Amino acid sequence: MTHYIQGQWHAGKGHDVASINPANAQTIWTGKTATAEQVNAAVDAARAAQFDWFMLGFDARLAIVEAYRSQLEANKAELAETIAQETGKPQWETATEVGAMIGKIALSAAAYNKRTGTEANDTPAGRAVIRHKPHGVVAVFGPYNFPGHLPNGHIVPALLAGNTVIFKPSELTPKVAELMVSLWDKAGLPAGVLNLVQGEVDTGKALASHPQLDGLFFTGSSRTGHFLHQQYAGHPGKILALEMGGNNPLIIKGVQDIKAAVHDILQSAYISSGQRCTCARRLYVEQGEQGNALIAMLAAAVKQIKVGPWNAQPQPFMGSMISETAAKGMVAAQTNLQNLGGVSLVELTHLEAGTGLVSPGLIDVTAIDVLPDEEYFGPLLQLVRYSDFDQAIKLANQTRYGLSAGLLADSREDYDYFLARIRAGIVNWNKQITGASGAAPFGGVGASGNHRASAFYAADYCAYPVASVEADAVSLPATLSPGLSL
């Protein structure tokens, strides 16, 4: 049970791969990668199934997607535990992820009807009708940080629109993908409508470059996303939706309740061990006594964050990072900032060799003239002190990314000023910047995406509009155009 093609499970024909629990280094899944021939078979299966799937109609497709929702409900404990073991996230957090997967069904159905349904109006020229059709065969590339929820956010709207899908998950979370697809199978999805190919870079390249793809929906790193954008640049007929990362700023200004502000900072920077694309990476705090008090409370709170394995009791706030390699990468990022002049207020440390367990870090980088514009994808928050609000906003905008940004401030006028000037696709006020609504679009500008917002707007990139002018019969106009005679 490694690859799912044409409604059947197949062993891979490539090289051996394994999935490792990053909290204890135990192997929890093994398999073989898909070869280019198996990728071809998956695309062929999706192509063969696509028209019949579209012709079922929306209501019939929705019924099957609803059956999948029922499977998620019935298996939510197993799915949450699988996500926890494979990602290292605490059980409380993976239960929330499964809940989001379940909620995605109703939200996607509502989005389909609101954004890509059918609308007809009578005009003097005839009946004007707007309809939407699926692109055809699309690939979904999933990330490791939300291995259920994020690919689910592409797959569900794609299927509702009438597309067929080849799903290529992160090579770090194959077990979650296998379980997800098995639930689709139990839901009665017709053969070929959803196919799963597991693998690493070679598998991904074989799928992304396949000539029979009509589109690709990607969530992941900016580096990979930019590579895909270059690859698709000469193919205007293919739809490409990119959701990438961010170097996200959070500004604090004039907040009286500093304990509440510290809570929102912790939730913004350290949830999921800092492995959310919307996590705060840069924190801007005013110079002065109030700012000093906030930083002192923040540093103390960061030191108290509980870190532990996914199944620890009592449950930790932070689990493991995705791998030991990722953990070591965060230590290296911190060292780089220290060498540039940063001063660690709370040092990030690798807690246990062979695992992805790290403690959270807080580093004052005010003395660094030019901060590296990098997405350090982990629990390391960079602190900058500022003297005036315009300076803070200017510094916040000094990034090639533009995913999320936030302001904690008691003044509505300050928020309006900030909202008008900040450059990001998600802008929150007095809320953690990792909080996003599935009933709203999700996406960014700059290096964070290619203007294909997901979540509620995923329906937009899953279908294309068809405009028609229609009449029940051919009819001769009352007056012919000049120069015509009949």
From Swiss-Prot:
One of the record's GO molecular function terms: succinylglutamate-semialdehyde dehydrogenase activity
GO biological process: arginine catabolic process to glutamate; arginine catabolic process to succinate
Catalytic-site annotation from UniProt: E243, C277
Protein's UniProt keywords contain NAD: yes
Keyword vocabulary terms for this entry: Arginine metabolism, NAD, Oxidoreductase
CDD domains tied to this protein: ALDH_SGSD_AstD (cd07095)
Pathway linked to the protein: Amino-acid degradation; L-arginine degradation via AST pathway; L-glutamate and succinate from L-arginine: step 4/5
Record carries keyword NAD: yes
Annotated protein name in UniProt: N-succinylglutamate 5-semialdehyde dehydrogenase
Lineage: Bacteria, Pseudomonadati, Pseudomonadota, Gammaproteobacteria, Alteromonadales
